[in-house]
């Protein structure tokens, strides 16, 4: 499809073309005001009272968009990415026209395009503030989240994310969403049933942004699915509450993973945000099946998907944020619910140790600075990039080390012996682990050395030679 909008239709004489060049252009663009007026007028006609009171015979026409009108309004959609055009649409009260279309039209394609144009316009701060301050428009847009048309839902989610990302108006939208409990149900339904990965990712970004902006809203949504049998007093109930939000997040994550695991970042971060509050952790681990499924998904990601032994170390730069979220959630589940069957030490500890150490080793490679760089970036740009990389890698390292220390504390003599035999606790890997755990986790490493000495005294002695501080303290 041609994404570059065309000027007004041909057929004008030279005098008319000069008029367009002289005063009919929108801002500094070549787009015609007169042509745009015509398209918007056509939109008004579509939703005018005489057209909306059609008989049942015309129902099909109401849900289909005329090809010529679709082409023209799509050009406006393209054009609205230009700030001059967006401002002109704002001055012409185009948002009110689009609101009328959304309130009255049953045509999915037309609704999608109108929300898409508003989404483009909202990318500019002044217009975003204006759109957000219109209560009626806000209500109509939120109502679009109840739509059954995936493209319309996608554009609505994109618009919401744009507004939520503007600090000046974000709180307005959070408050509106809190006032509409049905939005929670709609979003849960999308996450649990949609196979449209683009939509799932965008809805996930909206949820992630909402939770990041407002912990109260996150807690409300987490608690929203807690169901208690009406005929059973809560204090006598042995049934665990059913949390709807977490299973829906899990279903969305599975669907996204099936198409592209690299897009999982947003759903992993949502789970990470949930683990920052006690109710969020409980929502994960106190639903046995869901907790097990989440653990299995994340366990499989770190053991068989991300940052594998045959991947180049530099892959860590692409995967550092998703790995931080995944390991953070695994660590929270591991620390809070160790009695669960799926967390039995002999089943998970050695594969996790192997994955944790592998990521730490790749991190060491990534942080090695090349002596001579052929890149032409300025020193200031390089310094900024390295600072950002170091920041994210430091967050990841802190998460890895805390998780690794918790696993080390739970190791038994039998598990250590198995790890030495199978290679997860080789001299090289233990050295990498110690190098990262010391000095902050010295007591944990010292206790591990004591167990290791019972299993393989020579290996324990070699490690103590490489880390003299351990020998002094033991």
From Swiss-Prot:
Q: Which residues form a coiled coil?
A: none
Task: Say which family it is in.
Answer: Belongs to the SAAL1 family.
Q: Could you confirm whether the keyword DNA-binding appears in this record?
A: no
Query: What InterPro entries has UniProt attached to this entry?
Result: ARM-like, ARM-type_fold, Synovial_Prolif_Regulator
One GO BP annotation is:
positive regulation of synoviocyte proliferation
* Phosphoserine: modified positions: 6
List where Pro residues composition bias occurs: 1-10
Protein name, UniProt field: Protein SAAL1
Organism per entry: Homo sapiens (Human)
What keywords were assigned to this record?
Nucleus, Phosphoprotein
Q: Where is the signal peptide?
A: none
């Amino acid at each position: 499809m041609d994404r570059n909008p065309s000027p007004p239709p041909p057929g004008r004489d030279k005098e008319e073309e000069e008029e367009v060049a002289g005063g009919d252009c929108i801002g500094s663009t070549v787009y015609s005001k007169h042509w745009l007026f015509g398209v918007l007028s056509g939109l008004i006609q579509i939703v005018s009272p005489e057209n909306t009171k059609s008989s049942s015979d015309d129902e099909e026409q109401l849900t289909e968009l005329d090809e010529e009108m679709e082409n023209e309004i799509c050009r406006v959609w393209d054009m609205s990415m230009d700030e001059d055009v967006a401002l002109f649409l704002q001055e012409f009260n185009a948002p009110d026209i689009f609101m009328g279309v959304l309130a009255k039209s049953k045509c999915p394609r037309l609704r999608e395009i109108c929300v898409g144009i508003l989404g483009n316009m909202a990318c500019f701060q002044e217009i975003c503030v204006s759109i957000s301050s219109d209560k009626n428009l806000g209500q109509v847009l939120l109502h679009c989240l109840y739509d059954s048309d995936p493209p319309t839902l996608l554009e609505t989610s994109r618009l919401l994310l744009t507004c939520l990302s503007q600090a000046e108006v974000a709180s307005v939208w959070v408050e509106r969403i809190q006032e509409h409990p049905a939005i929670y149900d709609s979003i849960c339904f999308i996450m649990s049933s949609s196979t449209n990965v683009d939509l799932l990712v965008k809805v996930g970004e909206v949820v992630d942004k909402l939770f990041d902006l407002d912990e109260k809203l996150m807690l409300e949504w987490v608690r929203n699915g807690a169901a208690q049998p009406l005929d059973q007093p809560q204090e006598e109930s042995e049934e665990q509450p059913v949390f709807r939000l977490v299973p829906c997040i899990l279903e969305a994550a599975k669907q996204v993973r099936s198409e592209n695991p690299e897009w999982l970042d947003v759903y992993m971060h949502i789970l990470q945000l949930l683990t920052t509050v006690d109710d969020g952790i409980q929502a994960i681990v106190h639903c046995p099946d869901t907790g097990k499924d989440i653990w299995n998904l994340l366990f499989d990601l770190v053991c068989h998907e991300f940052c594998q032994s045959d991947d180049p170390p530099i892959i860590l730069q692409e995967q550092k944020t998703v790995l931080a979220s995944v390991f953070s959630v695994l660590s929270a589940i591991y620390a809070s619910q160790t009695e669960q069957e799926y967390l039995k030490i002999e089943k998970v500890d050695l594969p996790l140790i192997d994955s944790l150490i592998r990521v730490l080793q790749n991190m060491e490679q990534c942080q090695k600075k090349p002596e001579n760089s052929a890149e032409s970036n300025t020193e200031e740009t390089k310094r900024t990039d390295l600072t950002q990389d170091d920041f994210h890698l430091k967050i990841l390292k802190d998460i890895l080390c805390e998780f690794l220390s918790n696993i080390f504390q739970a190791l038994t003599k039998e598990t250590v012996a198995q790890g030495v035999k199978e290679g997860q606790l080789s001299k090289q890997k233990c050295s990498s682990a110690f190098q990262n755990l010391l000095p902050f986790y010295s007591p944990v490493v010292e206790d591990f050395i004591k167990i290791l000495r019972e299993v393989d005294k020579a290996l324990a002695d070699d490690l103590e030679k490489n880390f003299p501080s351990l020998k002094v303290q033991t």
